[in-house]
Amino acid sequence: MPDTVLYTAEAVSTGDGRNGHVTTSDQRIDLDLAVPVEMGGTGTGSNPEELFAAGYAACFHSALRVVAGRQHTALGDSTVTAQVGIGPDGDAYGLVVTLVIHVPGLEREKVREFADEAHQVCPYSRATRGNISVELRVL
């Protein structure tokens, strides 16, 4: 837990949860939600897994850049892709995540080192550690 909270995001869900609407207090996110076709829905809106994937990809990418920066290494046109899956987990549902890390022009072993360290400091990784499977895949 942080010693000091620097920023708090706030989002409100209305309607029917996964088939509803979500808005952030600053109105930057204002989305209709829909259950994916693969789960029996219409797939006509976004869903919690897409939003989680977007947040995790951005957060991990920032952590990766911080870690590399500490070693005075520029990551250039790096990308982090978060793949978030959902499926039955006993009598509930669970998530699985794969983070695909691509840093053109940097040795794969060095990227792996940075990714492993970023996984230790990324707030999303810290929040999910021990709760869901997170695979780091370095291209």
How should each PLM-predicted stretch be described?
Residues 1-54, 61-139:
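Extended beta-strand/beta-hairpin segments
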